[in-house]
Amino acid sequence: MEARVISCTTFGDNKVVKIAVLNHQAITKYKAGENETTVVVSDDTCPEKDVKEIKKFCEKLGYVYEGRLSEEYTQTNTGPDDDWITNGFESDDDVDPSIKTIGFNYPHVNRRNKLPDPVEKEKSVSLWSMIKDNIGKDLTKVCLPVYFNEPLSSLQKCFEDLEYSYLLDQASEWGKRGNNLMRILNVAAFAVSGYASTKGRICKPFNPMLGETYEADYPDKGLRFFSEKVSHHPMIVACHCDGTGWKFWGDSNLKSKFWGRSIQLDPIGLLTLQFDDGEIVQWSKVTTSIYNLILGKLYCDHYGTMLIEGNGEYSCKLKFKKQSMMDRNPHQVQGIVEDKNGKTVAKLFGKWDESMYYVMVNQGKESESHLLWKRNKPLENPTKYNLTRFGITLNELTPDLKEMLPPTDSRLRPDQRYLEKGEFEMGNREKLRLEQRQRQAREKQERGWKPTWFSKEKGSETYRYIGGYWEARDSGRWDDCPDIFGQVH
């Protein structure tokens, strides 16, 4: 039997090794005791005879084999991504080993790894033919057929920005250890990482109904997220997330303009991150544009200046460089971290769709560069929507989950569900029906309608979570939740 070590990273007393065995991918976690190292094989698809060979192979390397992981921790047949092992880090001797292994104790949760196969063949419809009469208008108010959507709502897209939430876990831990410079660097990497999933994504998310919600209970990431559409005109979505050592919240009013060959999206809103020790950090997103609406390949770009600041020791300024037509090195992000005296103490550089690095600056001299964040590997066979592995999980609806959700959750939206299954005609029919209902939303708002789970802060236009959602979920009481999607015909 062939067996070889693909990679081995040492984290203090812990070792994580990936072994390839025949046609099976076996991920093994080595945990070192005082006098021995134990080996756990987590691929339950591996035949028993191969497991015996793995045992011999491991013992030959000087390790003691201890068997497989329990079913609760067994990975999917495709095998987990390498990032499950390293938490996004490459080997770096300057990084505390215990920081790298944050999140290893989170439970594994089996989630789907592909969308359903489409039932119907999709129609070819020109985007230009649908929007050519709306030059200069706000496209959030333009109704498009379901063919131009992706099977996610704007509420779910808010959660997608938290794909690399481990960076905030690490930021929390750095702060606990008194290293607030590494904290702000990890926060900056997180602020950039949310854009990585947009590469190749040209379809529009569904505009939520007034009062529509979305929950994401992800113990495998150590967090719980909740969002709600709190206003129809202007269109505002608000979110709140409880993480491990931190809380994150914000609202977003997205202004869009169509300029003929491109669409410009300007986010209006403030994102707030609060650590358990009281430090608060805030920033706003940069401008996004989608190009080549008439001719050529559609692509998106993000550009502008992002300021990350709060009540801590450091602030960060990131510059997202605008892509030019002849740019051979697009998507660049550069930034600096300053102390309270305005002195530059670190620099950042990278690309929003690849990775971010940092260098320390001391008396004008720069250290070697170190990796902060690296994008997860894309799918080998992506769908037309170019969703990431994480993105594919966002609209998953299991029977058990369906029983617990309120009637306002995005997963229950019929046009979005039909689109995901590739039932385009039914999806379009339902989208038209719901848009008819949505036209009543402004009247509701004018009559004094208020969000169920969020309210404006006193003296501010910012929406904050008022609590109660997870308690209602635990009790199964959704009496205050309207049937916003109505009867499905």
UniProtKB/Swiss-Prot annotation:
GO molecular function, one term: lipid binding
Tissue specificity remark: Expressed at low levels in flowers.
Pfam families in UniProt: Oxysterol_BP
InterPro entries on file: OSBP_sf (IPR037239), Oxysterol-bd (IPR000648)
Keywords from the named record: Lipid transport, Lipid-binding, Transport
Keyword Transport: yes
GO terms, biological process: lipid transport
Family according to the record: Belongs to the OSBP family.
Function: May be involved in the transport of sterols.
Xref: PANTHER family: OXYSTEROL-BINDING PROTEIN-RELATED (PTHR10972), OXYSTEROL-BINDING PROTEIN-RELATED PROTEIN 1A-RELATED (PTHR10972:SF96)
Protein name in UniProt: Oxysterol-binding protein-related protein 1B
Organism: Arabidopsis thaliana
